[in-house]
From Swiss-Prot:
Residues 528-530 are annotated as: G5. Pfam families: EF-G_D2, GTP_EFTU, GTP_EFTU_D2, IF-2, IF2_N. Belongs to the TRAFAC class translation factor GTPase superfamily. Classic translation factor GTPase family. IF-2 subfamily. GO terms for biological process: translational initiation. Residues 392-399 are annotated as: G1. This is Translation initiation factor IF-2. It is found in: Cytoplasm. It comes from Geobacter sulfurreducens (strain ATCC 51573 / DSM 12127 / PCA). GO terms for molecular function: GTP binding; GTPase activity; translation initiation factor activity. NCBIfam families: IF-2 (TIGR00487), small_GTP (TIGR00231).
Length: 883
């Protein structure tokens, strides 16, 4: 036996630490506390029963509880004097089997600790002690109550109750040995217990009489308490177990009954077959029900599933009565990687449902079909005024030309009408009207084109005679060509001495705009907005172009138009400028525009006058929307309010579904996959660079990459930073933007992220060409990506001896981090790219500086810093390849 702590021994003996400490001190064993270590001989000493006869009442009671338990069974099994005579002789005498049995039971409880001392005591103990001990409990019943308080060791059962005490001794055995629940469940069965004893003890000649003792126990035991409690009593609880009956007959019967019932249940569940007796009818019903389910086939009408627009995988599986995993497996075989919440369109749902014997019926309302414009009879068409948009560089006199045209054709009291910001107005010339749209620059024009709004009939391109073609002029030409709108060029400021109209004509030839004088088809008019020169000629050319286009519309039908612009007015609510394109709009008409509906409550023309109706090509301000519509939305007049609300609600639902499965703009990584699927034949690109030579070289190199599978189109190229206009053009044309030694403006970056436009930035031209080539071949492997950190403006430059120039900066966006990669921009052109050598704030080195603070930044091996420069810091991230 190894060394043991006091608290461990107390736990094994089932007594408190204090009680064990008291007993150890009474035995002369020096211990300090419950953590003290006991040697093997000390453990034997404290667990062994004392040999001296009891001298006082209390001591006698304690000794009785420690030593008599093994012999109390003899006293209980026979008359009071029989144990005295039976115990006195040696172990070999006739009653000895009972005594030996008791010894065996004690050993069974704690074989490692108690077996040696018990064996020695059974051989050498004097006869008087057992006699006195056996007689004493019979004469002193109070000891029975104190017995639970003084158990000396786990193997010795301290209950002085006859047979129950012995049973509890066996119950305590699982607390120490491994098979815990086994003795507890079979407490009343004698044969299993005997087998346990035979496994633990050495062969003993007294094994046979044990059943006789058990029979006697059964005979002398009072009626048992309810068996229910017996089944759930924990083996380590002697108190509860002591009250349980010693008889095992009833327990055996109940246990056997339970086993039989359990086996029957298992057979019914796992091995269904012909049964007799209880449960036969239920099983027969279940079997017959199963057969019916197998042969049942849904009716033809039930095999039709009605869906609207789309349906999720989970919903389709539920309606067909199949598992979603089976449906997903079929879709994966068809090459679709989907989840249970993935929406399926009608075609895909029809295809997969046919695999399971179902049909799909599309019950969706095709709103576009319902609202589609019916072609008009030629006799019902009448001429309509042309819709003209004036575009051009801001400094080239676009606003002045608009003011000059309005002032020449509007009464004096309405000269300031341009400040009403209605966005559209009418001009009359010789009894004919012209509608001008005051769109907010190129951005709105491109946005309307991106939404498919074919509003503008003619574009007037304003170019200053003294400046020539400017970047915004190039963009305006590209926008007009992309929209398929004819262009009339107005060369403004011809009254200036430095005006060179011929140079403007020559520069515009690069874009395919050749003057009629030089054998082309483009109309050029030289005007002066300030001096009112050639304004009538310009309007006549507009009407001439309109006659060539033969613009007509039917006024006698429900109105259709386009939202030019919209706003939320505090007093009037949502207000929109509507350009009526066909039909006539009247007050009181119900309408739908995009996801909004409403009723026309009031209309105003461009001069602010209330009107009751508006015909084709007439711009009016409409009040009565339920919400603010988007520019470019189609405005449709309806007869029924209910129908208008239904259409608006349907569009809102469709918009939500579209946003959930939003189609992102094409990036280089996705190009190869789309080519493989045959979805893309053209790749549009916008090229921006720091010098014109780079623009031309890159554009030409990209055009040479075009093949039969992919045609690469450079739809726009110019010098300068990447602007919001470039992003809008790329979004509308599904193009990518390539930048060389230029950076996007902050607003352009945010807008590109929102629109999903892919912007690629390079320092070397051949890298861009190689990337495009790899993308077309499906070999693009992007591994490095730049992460933008912050932007700072240089407000002061300090010269520090032995260090160089230090830039005093104000952090505009993000944060500056020491030792980060930096880029110095001057007029949005990259001047330097390298590493940040120092970052200080108030002469202290800092790790980073956040937005809104000032700091000093030093660039590694670079001193050419000027006030107004911009410093960007960034870091390079390694991104896993995704194709």
């Amino acid at each position: 036996m190894s060394k043991t702590h006091v608290y461990e021994l107390a736990k094994k003996m089932g007594i408190e630490n204090k009680e064990l400490l008291t007993r150890l001190k009474s035995l002369g064993i020096e211990v300090k506390n419950h953590l003290s270590v006991l040697e093997e001989d000390e453990i034997l000493k404290v667990t062994a029963p004392p040999a001296a006869p009891p001298k006082s009442g209390p001591q006698e009671e304690v000794r009785v509880t420690t030593t008599v338990i093994r012999r109390r069974r003899v006293a209980e099994a026979a008359p009071a004097e029989t144990p005295v005579e039976a115990v006195a002789p040696p172990v070999e005498s006739a009653p000895a089997p009972l005594e030996v049995e008791a010894v065996e039971e004690a050993v069974v409880q704690a074989p490692p600790v108690v077996e040696p001392p018990v064996a020695r005591e059974s051989e050498a103990a004097p006869a008087e002690e057992p006699v006195a001990a056996a007689v004493k409990p019979a004469s002193e019943p109070p000891v029975v109550q104190k017995a639970p308080v003084a158990p000396a060791a786990p193997p010795v059962d301290d209950k002085p109750t006859a047979n129950k005490a012995r049973i509890l001794g066996r119950v305590e055995l699982p607390g120490i040995t491994t098979p815990a629940p086994k003795p507890a469940d079979r407490r009343e069965a004698t044969a299993p217990k005997k087998r346990i004893e035979e496994r633990i003890m050495t062969p003993s000649p007294t094994d046979r009489p044990a059943p006789a003792g058990d029979d006697r126990r059964k005979a002398g035991t009072p009626p048992p308490p309810p068996r229910k409690g017996k089944e759930f009593v924990a083996p380590a609880e002697p108190e509860r177990g002591a009250k349980k009956p010693g008889g095992g007959g009833a327990g055996k019967k109940k246990e056997a009954f339970k086993k039989t019932e359990l086996l029957e249940k298992r057979e019914r569940i796992f091995e269904p077959g012909p049964k007799t007796g209880k449960g036969k009818k239920r099983e027969r019903d279940m079997v017959s029900l199963g057969r019916k389910t197998e042969i049942t086939v849904p009716k033809a009408i039930k095999r039709i599933i009605k869906i609207s627009e789309s349906i999720t995988v989970g919903e389709l599986a539920k309606r067909m009565g199949v598992k979603a995993t089976d449906l997903i497996r079929v879709l994966m075989k068809m090459g679709m990687m989907v989840t249970i919440n993935h929406p399926l369109d009608v075609d895909t749902a029809t295809l997969v449902a046919s695999e399971f014997g179902y049909e799909i019926e599309n019950v969706a309302i095709d709103v576009d079909e319902m609202l589609e414009s019916v072609p008009d009879a030629p006799e019902s068409l009448t001429k309509r005024p042309p819709v003209v948009t004036i575009m051009g560089h801001v400094d080239h006199g676009k606003t002045s030309l608009l003011d000059a045209i309005r002032e020449a054709n509007v009464i004096a009291g309405e000269a300031g009408g341009i400040t009403q910001h209605i966005g559209a107005y009418d001009v009359e010339l010789n009894g004919r009207k012209i509608t001008f749209l005051d769109t907010p620059g190129h951005e709105a024009f491109t946005a309307m084109r991106a939404r498919g709004a074919k509003v503008t009939d003619i574009v007037i391109l304003v170019v200053a005679a003294d400046d020539g073609v400017m970047p915004q002029t190039r963009e305006a030409v590209n926008h007009s060509k992309a929209a398929g709108v004819p262009i009339i060029v107005a060369i403004n400021k011809i009254d200036k001495p430095e005006a060179k109209p011929e140079r403007v004509k020559q520069e515009l030839m690069e874009f395919g705009l050749v003057s009629e004088e030089w054998g082309g088809e483009t109309i050029f008019v030289e005007v002066s907005a300030k001096k009112r020169i050639n304004l009538p000629e310009l309007l006549e050319m507009v009407l001439l172009q309109a006659d060539v286009m033969d613009l007509k519309a039917n006024p006698d039908k429900d109105a259709r138009g386009t939202i030019v612009e919209a706003k939320l007015d505090r007093g009037r609510g949502p207000v929109a400028t509507v350009l009526v394109q066909e039909g006539t709009l009247k007050i009181g008409d119900y309408f739908v525009a995009g996801v909004n509906s409403g009723r026309v409550r009031a209309m105003q023309n461009d001069r602010g006058d209330k009107v009751n109706e508006a015909g084709p090509s007439m711009p009016v301000e409409v009040i009565g929307f339920t919400g603010v519509p988007d520019a470019g939305d189609v405005f449709i007049s309806l007869v029924d309010e209910k129908r208008a609300k239904e259409i608006a609600s349907h569009r809102q639902q469709k918009l939500r579904e579209t946003e959930l499965a939003k189609h992102s703009k094409m990036s280089l990584e996705q190009l190869y996959d789309k080519i493989q699927k045959g979805e893309v034949k053209d790749l549009n690109a916008i090229v921006k660079a720091d010098v014109q030579g780079s623009v031309e070289a890159v554009s030409e190199s990209l055009r040479k990459l075009s093949t039969d599978a992919v045609r690469l189109n450079v739809i726009h190229s110019s010098v300068g930073a990447i602007t919001e206009t470039d992003v809008n053009l790329a979004s509308a044309s599904n193009a990518i933007i390539l930048g060389f030694n230029v950076r996007p403006e902050p607003k352009a970056s945010a807008h590109a992220e929102k629109e999903g436009v892919d912007i690629r930035l390079y320092n070397i031209i051949y890298d861009a060409v190689e990337d495009i080539k790899k993308a077309m071949e499906g070999l693009l492997e992007p591994t490095l990506r730049e992460k933008y950190l912050g932007r700072a403006e240089v407000r002061e430059v300090f010269s520090v001896p032995k260090v160089g120039n230090v830039a005093g900066c104000y952090i505009q966006d993000g944060k500056m981090i020491r030792n980060a990669q930096v880029r110095l921009l001057r007029d949005n052109v990259v001047i330097y790219e390298g590493k940040m050598s120092s970052l200080r704030r108030f002469k202290d080195d800092v790790k980073e500086v956040a937005t809104g603070y000032e700091c000093g930044i030093g660039l590694e091996n670079y001193n050419d810093i000027k006030v107004g420069d911009v410093i960007e810091d960034f870091e390079i991230e390694k991104i896993a390849t995704t194709l």
